[in-house]
Amino acid sequence: MTTQGKFKKQLTLTDLTFIGLGAIFGSGWLFAASHVSSIAGPAGIYSWLIGGLAVLLLGIVYCELGAAPPRAGGIIRYPVFSHGELMGYLLGFITLIAFSSLISIEIVAARQYAAAWFPFLSQPGSGNPTLIGWLVQLLLLCFFFALNYYSVKTFAKSNNLISVIKFVVPLLVIVVLFSFFKPENLHSQGFAPFGSAGVEAAISAGGIIFAYLGLTPIISVASEVQNPQRTIPVALILSVVLSTIIYVLLQVAFLGSIPSEMLSGGWAGISQQFSLPYRDIAITLGMGWLAFLVVSDAIISPSGTGNIYMNATPRVVYGWARAGTFFKIFTRVDGESGIPRPALWLTFALSIFWTLPFPSWEKLIGVVSAALVLSYAIAPVTAAGLRRNAPDLPRPFFVRGFCVLGPVSFIISALIVYWSGWNTVSWLLGLQILMFVVYILFKNKVPTHAVSLKQQIWSSLWLIAFYALIIIASYLGSFGGINAIGHPWDTLTVAVIALAIYYWGAYTCLPQANFAGDEEE
């Protein structure tokens, strides 16, 4: 029998830090190094630093939000507090797509690497699964569903163990590859052979921002954290700083250990020569044992990240339902375990669905990256809005210098979305505008008891304008568009648009914060 219960505060700082690090270290680090090298050359090191800075700035903003009302599914509910239910609806839709498909991506990545040992898991000459391969994916999803079904502490213990195991290999890779380090590689063909455009493009197209996106699971479990006002900020900052250090060292180690003769044709072909960067470089250098460990870790790392998002996504669904713009059944929390089980069942079903039409890792990576950044990007405007309409809200973690950090972090988020390219931006942001229209068409079904529909629309117009202007800029720009606005003027244009939209969004928040029906879980 399922009774309505409450979330249980069982997660410690260690648990939360490992959730953050574990979510960040999935399949991204295993693919990105060679892609970044092909797009930016050695200057890809700067791409990793810029990506880390962007996520750190957003993480600091999330510290203020996550500590000052810690709520399950906070990524959805904070915009509802500041700008109304329509904002929660738009964020809920895009975040559910991103999180649920990310579970599938990681499980698919684990299966693709496992095919190096068990070829019958993948179709010959393809990353697509055989029937047996798909059933293996399904079994993994069932296993992670079971881990998350009974207790959040069961999930945390399993995640801590997986995280420790999967970090040993990247650290070992760094140490071993540095023993082959050749400094002259960093100047082969010039340090930045593709200029600043290459550095920018690598952040999105190279998989860097995908590799970093692991903060929202920390926010999603905020109601289950012991001493959240201290634990959430420390765990967020630790996760980003540690991951940035490891990623930069991995990239430098990869760049410096490539045999010099393989660079004679330039950097552009490196991703073809090293499609699985660290496995392939280990084989090239004659270290079969390291290649074996990399493949082993390549199975464990994505699986661990998939487990984390199997835990985080139900909290997002719960937050969306609590906002009043999704089915009420998903607000139910099991009384004994403290798990939002209806939301977990939906997550499980969606994660299976995403393995059907999009069977390979490469086909979803760009879309999921942009979708996740969109869910992150709203945080600075939400925090600015709550400072205006809820100035007395207790803020145990108060971000100083927010007048600079807020707009800068929003601008960087907008640029990352723009750098994803026209093919991704056009349909993803277009779909969000369509969802806005659907909300208006079903005006008799939407919640208006706390905030009128007129006010919800007024407080959300800035986001729709943001989507529309980024679509136009992407079409006219140099990242997959018609190049009517060349680089770097297109990037500068998007930055100016984002700055204007930030202040529009901050100043059109609700007159009073919308905490109607919100009580601590």
Per-region residue spans from a language model:
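Terminal cytosolic tails of multi-pass membrane transporters
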Residues: 1-10, 383-405, 426-521
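Membrane-interface "cap" regions at the ends of multi-pass membrane proteins
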Residues: 1-34, 38-43, 49, 56-63, ...
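Helix-loop-helix junctions that connect adjacent transmembrane segments
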Residues: 2-7, 42-45, 50, 121-132, ...
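Extracellular loop-to-transmembrane helix junctions
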Residues: 8, 31-136, 242, 249, ...
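Loop-to-transmembrane helix boundary motifs in multi-pass membrane proteins
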Residues: 8, 13, 131-138, 226-229, ...
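Membrane-helix boundary/coupling elements in multi-pass transport proteins
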Residues: 71, 94-109, 212, 216-225, ...
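TM-loop-TM module centered on a large, flexible mid-protein loop between adjacent transmembrane helices
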Residues: 77-80, 84, 115-123, 194, ...
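Membrane-interface loop-to-helix entry segments
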Residues: 132-183, 195, 236-240, 368-377, ...
